[in-house]
């Protein structure tokens, strides 16, 4: 049986990937209720954005794939680097420095824990031959 995954992607988020990865690492592998609680009380700029993305992925799973909300967990979540917007910062004597405003692409995949159990059972039954 193929596992059903629900996915949500946020692109061109104006948060540096390094800062977004700090928040993303907190919720990897957690169930949805735990992840929402963690994100609600995390005092980082990326936390509300990732919470909104998590809620979007949950809605995709419940409405499109008809999965049970209580059995969902974060299967994988990662942050890729987006565009770098180059801006000038004025310095002394008419010179300037380049500032790179970094953006992020955040991908979140959730799946049902029943899918995980059935795939483990299939692997175990297949290895006993």
Curated annotation (Swiss-Prot):
Origin superkingdom: Bacteria
GO cellular component assignments: cytosolic large ribosomal subunit
Transmembrane segments: none
A Pfam match: Ribosomal_L22
Record key words, sorted: Ribonucleoprotein, Ribosomal protein, RNA-binding, rRNA-binding
Keyword Ribonucleoprotein: yes
Record GO biological process: translation
Any GO MF annotation of the entry: structural constituent of ribosome
Protein task: This protein binds specifically to 23S rRNA; its binding is stimulated by other ribosomal proteins, e.g. L4, L17, and L20. It is important during the early stages of 50S assembly. It makes multiple contacts with different domains of the 23S rRNA in the assembled 50S subunit and ribosome. The globular domain of the protein is located near the polypeptide exit tunnel on the outside of the subunit, while an extended beta-hairpin is found that lines the wall of the exit tunnel in the center of the 70S ribosome.
Family: Belongs to the universal ribosomal protein uL22 family.
Subunit note: Part of the 50S ribosomal subunit.
PANTHER family with a match to the protein in the record: CHLOROPLAST 50S RIBOSOMAL PROTEIN L22-RELATED, LARGE RIBOSOMAL SUBUNIT PROTEIN UL22M
UniProt name for this protein: Large ribosomal subunit protein uL22
Organism per entry: Onion yellows phytoplasma (strain OY-M)
Organism ancestry: Bacteria, Bacillati, Mycoplasmatota, Mollicutes, Acholeplasmatales
Gene (UniProt): rplV
